[in-house]
Structures are given as C-alpha cells and as structure tokens.
Amino acid sequence: MLKYFGTDGVRGVANQGLTPEMAFKLGRDGGYVLTKNKKDGEQAKVLVSRDTRISGQMLEYALISGLLSVGIEVLEVGVITTPGLSYLVRAQGADAGIQISASHNPVEDNGIKFFGSDGLKLSDEMEGEIEKLIDAEEDTLPRPSAEGLGTVTDFHEGSAKYLQFIENTIPEELDGIKVVIDGANGASSALISRLFADCGVDFTTIYTHPNGLNINDHCGATHTENLQKEVVKQGAQLGLAFDGDADRCIAVDENGNEVDGDHIMYVIGSYLAEHGRLKKDTIVTTVMSNLGFTKALEKEDLKNVRTQVGDRYVSEEMRAHGYNLGGEQSGHVIMSDYHNTGDGMLTGLHLMLVMKKTGKSLSELLKDFKDYPQCLVNVPVTDKKSWKEHQPILDVIAEVEKDMAGNGRVLVRPSGTQDLLRVMAEGPTQEETDAYVDRIVKVVEKEMGTNK
C-alpha cells in the first residue's frame, strides 16, 4: 500500500498535510521519474495546471520549482479542468502533466495528480517509485546549475485548444434544449459559457464566480439541491452540475430529479447501442453501480462489467478489453471514442445530443430504469483488512444472498481511508433491504466491532 498516493494522486489539507515543501519534492522527484528516459540533450516537457482553490498558486509555484531543479521545461496552463490537462498532455506531445486539485473535496483540501505522456493516471508501480525518492535519506538527483535548469512558459492558450476539441465531438448545434449549468465555482467556471455558447445551447449558469474560497461550497456535482430548484424555477429541460475540477457530471431532469452517473451512462449507452456504436454491447462500471442499472441493460440485451471502486480501474478495464463507455455512479463518465478520462463538460454535451436526436426528455429516456432501494451502513471495526477471515460474517452474507434469490445484492468492503467496514445491500423494497443490512451489521459488530 502506498504511503502518499491515494486513488487520485496525493491529497491533504493545504499547507498542513500537503505543504509547499511536499509540493517541491513531488515536482522534483515526480518530474525525474516521469522524464528520466529522455535522450541526452533532449529537454523534457511537463504541463502544470490547477483549479480555483486559494492554495493552488502556493502549491503550483513550489511544484514548478521542483520541476525546474531537475531541468524540466514547464508549460504553465493556469486554471483548467483535469480532463482538459489530460487532453493537452497528449495534444502537445508532452512527457507528463500535473494537475493541482482536490476535485470535489472542500476548499481546505488540495491535491497533486500526475499524468503520463498518454494523458492517463500513473500506475501504482510508478507512484511507488516516486515515493521511494521522496523518502530517501539523501537526495541524489541531478542538480544542474545555469545551463541545465528548466524554464517556464505560459500556455494559457491551452484552454481554447481544449474547448475546440470538445466542440468538435458534437456534430450539430444543440439548440432547442434549455439548460441550467452549475460550475461549482471551480475549474470549469471560465470555460462553460465559451463552450456551450459555441455549441448553440440555450443556457444559464450558476456558481461560476470563484473567489478562491467558494469551490464546491454547497454547489456542484456533490450538492445539486440548488440546481434542482433552479431547473424547475426556470422551466428548463435539463440541469448539469460539474465538480471542482469538472471530471464529473451529474444531471437534473426537467422535474428537478437528480440523475447520477449510472443513469447518464444508461441513456448514452442505449443510444450508442441502438446505432451500433456501443462496443461489445457493454458498459463498464464499478461495484457501486445500482443493481437497477444492470437490470435495465439486460432488458436491452446489453452487458455490464464491474470493477473495483475508482475511475482508473474502469479506464484500465476499458482499455484492456476494447470497451468504449464506462464510469462511476458519482458522475465520472469515460467516452473513450473521444477522451481517455472522465470529462464532465463532454459528458453533458453528449447527454444533450441524445436528447436532441431522440426528441425525448431525460425522464422519458429513463422510464425503463428502476433503481433498487439501497441501504449502506459504515461499521467501525478493529481490523478492516481481516474481515474475510471471520467465518460468521461470510456465513451471514451467504444466507442473505440466498434469501434474496437473485432479486438483490450484497456488497461488503473496507473503507479506503478509515477503519470502517462498509455494508451495503440493494433489494426490492427499502424495508427488506434495511433488514438484510441489519442482519449482516449485527454479526460484523459481534465479530470485529470496536464496541464488541
């Protein structure tokens, strides 16, 4: 298990857990690992960008200093979305990209996320190599003086290149659909109006005025309450909410109901399949996707492949087996015909394209998708990794699954960050589902609960 890197880069409270000193080390050590295979005399090139958090510039300058110290040429993109940086790394033929963002997390947090030359997140092995250098007793990396140092160049025109790329994936103007868009006061705030206007969309925006402190503050993909009200108030056909770095998209239908990533993938996937464009008739999701998603796909003779939690694992599965649509319930949707990572703005526009092409409202497109009631309980435990060694827990899970008789599912997994065991079930009614979870939770608490 890695010490600094989580499922989405290095994260922490800015200036406390994630300090400028740490950012410098990540720039120096990470930059070296990513570019050490360059031929002699060929200078490595790395793109650096950030979201709108007040701590972003502090960390950016420290990170860039680390990169420059090992002779790397830095292209400073400024504020842009995470998928925007991923695209630009490939488009510019850069050796790597580094985004400073904590995505949907509150403003106190920040993160540093690395991308390879392919625009994809790093492998666990490469992240481990960076960590070894960070923890080394002595810094033995090159320290050029004068001629061998790196330089910084502004690349703020990168935003325009990225927006043009997204616009080119839409074959026609998206007029006739009124949309309200929530930018989460994040990285997409300055981009939304330019992109959606160029695509002919009738739209209004909310939460697109970042001040460094208001990113994700009761807005964006994890807080859609105000967007839901605004869609109904304005009589709009659709609402779109992005998170702080706009790699997620959550929608709102014309009735003000939230539409998560499962539902968005179902709508887009069904349309692609109908036109023979869904590869292998399969959508890749994580184990967190609702059972109703799989049941809805089965009605259309489509398949669902599931991975462990994390969009990187969805992406790996898609690349390994040639699938072109996948994502997470949380709103990461990967449309690999266009992009190799989740992109909120791209997803939103393609959802609109399906609505326009079919002439149907979002609620009509989802009429055959019935969510199964879900219950999730987080149980504090003494050792989350050893839960499978407790036979009574395995037995009660098997008993519950037998009682479900194929009309429900159980998912038990340890938390990635806390000493918790997450017990989740889905079933035909909320009452039955709650009872299933309660049966399992009681055994978990008896076997390994902190209060047993």
Swiss-Prot record:
Coiled-coil residues: none
Entry's cofactor comment: Binds 1 Mg(2+) ion per subunit.
Source species, domain of life: Bacteria
Top EC category: isomerase
EC number: 5.4.2.10
Requisite cofactors: Mg(2+)
Protein family according to the UniProt entry: Belongs to the phosphohexose mutase family.
HAMAP family linked to this entry: GlmM_B
Family matches, as PANTHER family: PHOSPHOGLUCOMUTASE (ALPHA-D-GLUCOSE-1,6-BISPHOSPHATE-DEPENDENT) (PTHR42946:SF1), PHOSPHOHEXOSE MUTASE (PTHR42946)
The name this protein goes by in its record: Phosphoglucosamine mutase
Species of provenance: Lactobacillus acidophilus (strain ATCC 700396 / NCK56 / N2 / NCFM)
